[in-house]
Amino acid sequence: MRRIITFILIVAFVSQSHGWGATGHRVTGMIATNHLNKKAKKRIEALLGQESLAMASTWMDDIRSDSTYNYASDFHWVTVESGQTYDQSKKNPNGDVIMTIERLITELKSGKLDRTSEIRNLKFLVHLVGDIHQPLHVGCCDDQGGNKVQVKWFGGNSNLHRVWDSDIIEGTKLSYTELAQSLGAPDEATIKRLQSGNVRDWANEAMTYRTQVYETGNGNLGYNYSYKNLPLIRERLLAAGVRLAGVLNDIYGK
């Protein structure tokens, strides 16, 4: 019984600490798949086999209990103080989401990775492009990306990071396929606009939402907070998927 309780506590901690929840990440993976060109799709399928990008998107969270990957624990996030740029910010010697995405893209483009390393890097990339579009993964303070900001969510205990990772999304009662489909198909102009920037542009964009994210009033969150922020979450998921497709087409589709 003690082992079961310990396992439940570990799962609860992991689920509220890193990335969009499974639904959000899988939405991003599904949208990306829908925007891959034929060559990129074929090459990615050759690497992942029957595993879709949607399913591969959560692998980086799934392996958190494997100590082999402890080195990757800081890859999910970055801290950039308000008023600073990433270049001006203090860097984490263990890495962060920005430098890791940039490194993964460079390594995947090089064509020098063995198959196992390429698959690992691909799965890392799919996950982290999702992470950087969750505004609290580009943190500004010492609150661990909102994990230390305790709030009530429809009367239950939660924290701001968890609200953005999964609480609002779970409130839609939609599967990842239903949520992805509900976002619609962006037109060519929107795709071009979303894919025109780079990783640091994405981080700068995430920083612009800080005021909105932290407007929690007395901390009793529910319908009003969800109503105000669900449209932004939907936009973030769509942008992440389209941009991920752009990166993958650049790596595998030329």
Regions found by a protein language model. Name each.
Residues 4-13:
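Sec-dependent N-terminal signal peptides
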Residues 18-128, 135, 141-254:
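N-terminal, motif-rich segments that launch catalysis or mediate targeting to/interaction with membranes
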